[in-house]
Amino acid sequence: MTRIEAVRYRPILDSRGNKTVEAEVTTDDGGFGRAAAPSGASTGEHEAVELPVGEAIAAGRERIAPRLEGREFAGDQRGVDAALHAADDTTDFSAVGANVAVATSMAAAKAAADVLGVHTYQHLGGALRGRNFPVPLGNVLGGGAHAADATAIQEFLVAATGAPSVRQAVFANAAVHQRVKDRLDDDGVPAAKGDEGAWAPSIDDATAFDVVAGAAAEVADEFGFDVRLGLDLAAAERYDGDEYVFGDDRRSTAAQIEYVAGLVSEYDLAYVEDPLDENDFEAFAELTDRVGDETLVCGDDLFVTNTERLQRGIDAGAANSILVKPNQIGTLTDAVDAIELATRNGYDAVVSHRSGETEDTTIAHLAVATDAPFIKTGAVGGERTAKLNELIRIADEA
């Protein structure tokens, strides 16, 4: 095994122009890994804590590096991540920051893969690696916390579930993204882009469904395979403690369940993320009972990549899939533990980016390593296509 020789940190910019943490890990036999932490806009209240970048880097240098340098082996991911927890000594990384922790964890994994002369997904995969590749979920139109004066629903997603290859799925999503813009232009609707590169027109949700469904149908006809729709409702952002407020519509929990169930039926949705409040396991269970045989009901803010919350959901029958974001929980080991728990209990695990991203491609490798059915990482934009292009390369070399 290869011992960690040096750990270095620096501030860099993410896709929103905000500072984030980049970590570099070097081993005593020349292995090298570099990784950067992403950052979310609509964050769950139960996520691990992200510290201001300067504080996180200082904590990394003072508390993390001394625990790793000369003491831990890069190839022992569980040992590295245990040392990160020991350096923090809280349950949510509030002492050192989940941003510096996850950057370090991912950089160590890359350094270990470098020493072994294998890809990161091969190093991480082990027994979890199957023969499939994840289908990209691409955000093509939206609003919510990602864009002002746009749709109330945060993300309108597309997934080329019928594509014969990762490459074709990626290209199909990009084509839908362009067709959405063409349709908006035809209707005289201007649209800038939101945080994740999706179009953010000032239209209501009903109009958005028409635009995206029409664009997806055109691309499906052109490419010759199914392109299905999905949603991230980010409902916790719309819940006022009594009702769900989406634009001019106010709905009780029962009405929200009916609304989402109706959307699943009307649009044949492949995926529905955070349709209800992040603390309402009972409502999630009711919706899952209604539509779980037809679509993935995915918990993001509900589970925050946390095994304790996931186990609570499993016990309640809440959702049937989990969104996995390593920075929500702080380490790759914790993320993989959540994936393993989900898989053992019949839940799918969908690996995801954040709205504030970098060119780091670790999540592409994590999705392949763990045989994820979907990877949610946008449709266009340099920090999004970095992951998508990496998926294409991995598929070509596999």
Curated annotation (Swiss-Prot):
Lineage of the species this protein comes from: Archaea, Methanobacteriati, Methanobacteriota, Stenosarchaea group, Halobacteria
Record PANTHER family: ENOLASE (PTHR11902:SF1)
Active site (UniProt): 196, 325
Pathway: Carbohydrate degradation; glycolysis; pyruvate from D-glyceraldehyde 3-phosphate: step 4/5
Protein name: Enolase
Task performed by this protein: Catalyzes the reversible conversion of 2-phosphoglycerate (2-PG) into phosphoenolpyruvate (PEP). It is essential for the degradation of carbohydrates via glycolysis.
Keyword Lyase set for record: yes
One GO term describing the cellular component: extracellular region
Record localization: Cytoplasm; Secreted; Cell surface
Cofactor note: Binds a second Mg(2+) ion via substrate during catalysis.
Catalytic reaction equation(s): (2R)-2-phosphoglycerate = phosphoenolpyruvate + H2O
Protein's organism: Halobacterium salinarum (strain ATCC 700922 / JCM 11081 / NRC-1) (Halobacterium halobium)
Example of a GO MF term: magnesium ion binding
